[in-house]
Amino acid sequence: MTDYSNSPDLKGSVLGQSTEYIDQYTPSLLFPIARKLNRDALNIDEAALPFKGQDIWTGYELSWLNAKGKPQVAIAVFTFACQSSHLVESKSFKLYLNSFNQTRFNSRDEVKQHLVKDLTAVVNSLVQVTLYNADEYNCLPYTPLPGECIDDLDIEIDNYDIDAHSLKSQSNKTVTETLHSHLLKSNCLITSQPDWASVIIRYTGEQICRESLLRYLISFRTHNEFHEQCVERIYSDLSTQLSIKNLEVYARYTRRGGLDINPYRSTHNNDTPFAVKINRQ
């Protein structure tokens, strides 16, 4: 497996570094990371992506001052197309949002315009931004994940190194089913801090051996990679190792630094059809 944690493209990242918290609007704090780094390791051609999808970020700690100096707060939902050339490094995103804290803006719409402009410039693709007042944000209450949970399978685990070849078919019978697990854990590519997630897998194809799928997902437990990259790896491995016609992979990660990241990849949908929010978020 290719290790790109020491790539020159990651130099300058604030992850793992002591940083100064700036409270005046500073868009230059945003640090882009090329999606190509991970995709090259997976033999994914960026000119002909094998999937569609989006990365949905929720920002719970956005605040600024109005024209009179009175603090305003909002919850922000940011949607990045997976076709964008770059993603935003999460700590730089947090620092960027903090830079709004003591900056005066004339309106919430002006804040949104800055967010859209800055993020779009960093990832080279239009970013959708929706701002909610604190009392408005109830559009995603906790809902049970769709499909069957595979976490209660009684299996023995003795390997925590990702092995795509461990994925097996249960039978040649073609099925359409939705499975989910709350046992996905990966680690930050730079800092090795743990990242926790629940993952939904919906597919049409030869029936997946659930024991092999659970072992595979658990094998991410010691793996260092960004959230979006883990989901693309899961999608790629399932597509490569199994006879699957339609596939959707959606992970809901718990928040860190006031942000949660929720990547979705699909053979056929640009937007996730799963309106879910896990209770750990």
From Swiss-Prot:
This protein's pathway reads:
tRNA modification; tRNA-queuosine biosynthesis
Predominant place of localization: cytoplasm
- Localization per record: Cytoplasm
Any one cellular component term from GO for this entry?
Answer: cytoplasm
* Class in the EC hierarchy, top level: oxidoreductase
**Residues the record marks as active site:** C188 (thioimide intermediate), D195 (proton donor)
What reaction is this protein's catalytic activity? 7-aminomethyl-7-carbaguanine + 2 NADP(+) = 7-cyano-7-deazaguanine + 2 NADPH + 3 H(+)
Name the NCBIfam families for this protein: QueF
Q: Which family does it belong to?
A: Belongs to the GTP cyclohydrolase I family. QueF type 2 subfamily.
- The identity of this protein, by name, is NADPH-dependent 7-cyano-7-deazaguanine reductase
Top-level taxonomy:
Bacteria, Pseudomonadati, Pseudomonadota, Gammaproteobacteria, Alteromonadales
